[in-house]
Amino acid sequence: MVKKAKWLKNVKKAFSPDSKKLKHESVECQDSVISYPVLIATSRSSSPQFEVRVDEVNYEQKKNLYPPSSDSVTATVAHVLVDSPPSSPESVHQAIVVNRFAGKSKEEAAAILIQSTFRGHLARRESQVMRGQERLKLLMEGSVVQRQAAITLKCMQTLSRVQSQIRSRRIRMSEENQARHKQLLQKHAKELGGLKNGGNWNYSNQSKEQVEAGMLHKYEATMRRERALAYAFTHQQNLKSFSKTANPMFMDPSNPTWGWSWLERWMAGRPWESSEKEQNTTNNDNSSVKNSTNRNSQGGETAKSSNRNKLNSSTKPNTPSASSTATRNPRKKRPIPSSIKSKSSDDEAKSSERNRRPSIARPSVSDDETLSSSTARRSSNLIPTTKSARGKPKSQTSSRVAVTTSTTEESSILPEKAPAKKRLSTSASPAPKPRRSSAPPKVEKGVLKAERTP
């Protein structure tokens, strides 16, 4: 700070005039120029001794075209002072000093003096300016000024560099924001166009984020469900041993759960379709159950009605017909040999093994109908034998033989027809139903009472 203050003082001194010197200098005589206060001093007392002959001075000046020199002026002044008698100091101050402007008027002398003083002032000022320029030149060529100039230039360069970087960054950010805004607008327009064209417009009051969160939650739930099902299925498969089928399905032998996992994944990926299909399947199952129950009821009713008709026909008092049937077949039927029976049983076992399926299923409605019809036939064949046995004890042996032959024939015929009916029932029945026990009605007591009454 001290050096800076000194430097500023030096600069100010270089450009400021010397006012102090002008104040202290009262009278200066440079280049034979008399100052203004000396010329203004005039004597109030005009004495004839000190009168100056103006005509003579003018005449001399006219002769000499150039103005008188300083030596002549000083000589004249000294001559006048020598010639004058001694007097008081007041009279000395009032003495008129003869100068070179003696032959001119006062106005002309004043104008000349003013011009000379003004020219001297201009010359002094020019010299001061020249001195100040030299001092300034010396200061500018110094090391301090050079150091300060280098520092200022570096600061200006850094400021300009920072400003240029800030401007370029602002321009780049504005361009990036514009490009991003355009991309968002294009994406939004594409989404709207796709939704309008697809017709999958969502009219819910939820926001896009909420809808996406719900879809993600559903997807995670389906994936969890699929994993749980796969885990349970693998454990069930490890616990159970499935029998190999004759015609295996098309699947990967290394991965036994190939078809199941693919189907489950496909169904889990479409929850709305799976819900609709489940509803349809439940409706179909309900309708099939209703149809099966109706068929069961109809089959049971028909079986019951047929059994009742047969029982009524058998309970009627037709003793001569029974006796005639017993007398018509007096011949004894030959019993079937054991070899034929064994062959028929082997054939039946082979046919049943061929037609047997690996799937475990319960007998359906047709099986119940076959069982009911077979029991009804057996009961109808047994009832007349009891009547004839009680009516005619002599023909007991023949009736027993007939009954045994008829039962063996029926037993040999029924197993051959049963597998075909079972195959039809398993293919026609939609789902396994519980077994319906169809036993023949107990009619022995009623028959005995009807026989006793007549």
Curated annotation (Swiss-Prot):
Keyword field contains ATP-binding: no
Protein name: Protein IQ-DOMAIN 1
Domain of life: Eukaryota
Biased composition (Low complexity): 397-412
Family indicated by similarity: Belongs to the IQD family.
One GO location term (cellular component): cytoplasm
Gene giving rise to this polypeptide: IQD1
Positions with biased composition (Polar residues): 280-328, 371-388
Span list, region Calmodulin-binding: 103-113
Molecular function in Gene Ontology: calmodulin binding; microtubule binding
Extent of motif Nuclear localization signal: 421-428
InterPro entries linked: IQ_motif_EF-hand-BS
Entry keyword set: Calmodulin-binding, Cytoplasm, Cytoskeleton, Nucleus
Ranges where the record places region Disordered: 272-454
Subcellular location: Nucleus; Nucleus, Nucleolus; Cytoplasm, Cytoskeleton
General remark: IQD1 overexpression leads to increased resistance against herbivory by generalist chewing and phloem-feeding insects.
Record-annotated IQ domain positions: 107-136
Main subcellular localisation: nucleus
Subunit structure, interactors included: Binds to multiple calmodulin (CaM) in the presence of Ca(2+)(e.g. CaM1 and CaM2) and CaM-like (e.g. CML8 and CML9) proteins. Interacts with KLCR1.
Pfam hit, one: IQ
Species per Swiss-Prot/TrEMBL record: Arabidopsis thaliana (Mouse-ear cress)
Induction: By mechanical stimuli and aphid infestation, but not by jasmonate, salicylic acid, 1-aminocyclopropane-1-carboxylate (ACC) ou auxin (IAA).
Ranges annotated as biased composition (Basic and acidic residues): 343-356, 442-454
Primary role: May be involved in cooperative interactions with calmodulins or calmodulin-like proteins. Modulates expression of glucosinolate pathway genes. May associate with nucleic acids and regulate gene expression at the transcriptional or post-transcriptional level. Recruits KLCR1 and calmodulin proteins to microtubules, thus being a potential scaffold in cellular signaling and trafficking.
Tissue spec: Expressed in roots, flowers, stems, siliques, inflorescence stems and whole shoots. Restricted to the vascular bundles.
Keyword Signal (UniProt): no
